[in-house]
């Protein structure tokens, strides 16, 4: 037992010896290896991706509970390489960047369909409820699955949200009801319904409402002086609902559909500044979409096919009651139509070929007099091949992209087309050890957003796409030391380049415009550790630790003062970790995430340095199993050290707060 304590001290110290956080690396296993021992090991407690050919992370519902995760933003803090932009509070926008790439380079999918915002290019993940999530998956520099739509492989990284997919064996109604309440006026009811109405048809629905005042206190510091304030104009009313249907078309086929609606009316607090806390901004976001999917497999297993279709509509209504003559008020509307066809051919065990063809149409219009009403046609085609043996996995892919731009009232952006290759490999050098070496390369680009192309004065229709190159080399290792102790470790090093980076420069004294001048280099290391130890019957420890080093610098021109400086909002070091004690009475989780210092500007101006911080939390929970259902209670204390910090400059985050969750399902 003494020896065990020493081991645990070493493990739990990993998140504490570095000055900031990272996240667990646990990609989803989509590789079907014939060595049964490999499959068993990878399934252990949600793997760190021992056999995956690309780095990433997977969190399933069990992981989410074991790590004390409270929302999707909290989950992203636990994933290595992620840079989350968070504007604070329950209603603050939250977007994802990965390994120094901006949010525009990170694709986000919801049940296999890509989410999009062609106006800004970034997706706000705070819109989606963690309570409805089955798993969260982050893949960096490629995908492990060969049978994907072309759009799913068109980003530098992909964050996938998969919702609950229960299909009850009986035909009775199954319900889950939940109530969350917490600090700063936070209350959120959630309800989930699922029923197998026949042997082939399953229906489900869920809905969530969130109300929060978000009036948390904060402190402003100016030299030796401190001012205490409280966030105002920060109220949020948000709700969303979904209807889902699943139909089995026989032994080898299935159809699924989803209808989704989201509505969020919120006040915007603006930046925190001295001597004035007056702000009159508000934003009303609405989003609705319908999507449909079909999958079919041949009886002989040689062929598989799938088709997807989606229509998406969204609107944003911005108001500022203090702007002169309401000149800042604006309304925006976006529409998207999407279709995809894909086929996979598996001539023999271990060898697969896949082809996918996607079409996307996007347009945008607004209430502004300067609106040019832009639209875009996108054609994507991908060809993939995957070869698998018990010790070797090879995956190659080529993506051909065509972007055709137009504008009804002005100059259209430049059209573009490009061929983007990628390659990944995983090799197991010793058959007696669960030790793997992996490497991957991906070339990809992103088209300019509508804001970058068309926003009045600021946009430029002559922009070229940003092109990225990603190179990764890593090792993974898993060891079962006894029937009581398991350990998984992954370590990856990477080198990324971005060219033709889109940056804003002053056109004259009053007007800024977007141009392609930037070059950025990103190099770093990610390490994650996960394990469990059986202390005694019904008593176990689950632990996780992660570290990330990200050196992301300007490489455009050595003669310029910004050359070699760390890019804004990216910490050099970050760590995260959690420990859960599972027991028959009350499960306890201690978790934390920390960042080193960052800069709020690429030029590192005086006064733009953001101090590092460590955010620590405590979760206690218990589940009561009853004859006809299950009842659970959970309590969370967030930022238990009451640290004052900012993720985005001048947007203070909440200090210590609490949240209680009551859940009943039957």
Q: Residue ranges of each PLM-predicted region?
A:
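A beta-strand signature from Gram-negative outer-membrane beta-barrel systems
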Residues: 130-176
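Flexible loop and strand-edge segments within Gram-negative outer membrane beta-barrel domains
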Residues: 214-218, 228-241, 246-305, 311-336, ...
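Surface-exposed extracellular loop regions of Gram-negative outer-membrane beta-barrel proteins
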Residues: 402-409, 413-416, 427-472, 489, ...
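Extracytoplasmic beta-strand/coil segments of soluble accessory domains associated
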Residues: 73-114
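Gram-negative outer-membrane beta-barrel transporters
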Residues: 349, 391-394, 492-497, 516-601, ...
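N-terminal periplasmic "start-of-domain" segments of outer-membrane beta-barrel proteins
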Residues: 35-65
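Membrane-embedded beta-barrel scaffold of Gram-negative outer-membrane proteins
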Residues: 302-318, 437-440, 466-523, 528-532, ...
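C-terminal beta-signal and adjacent terminal beta-strands/loops
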Residues: 543, 594-601, 609-611, 619-666
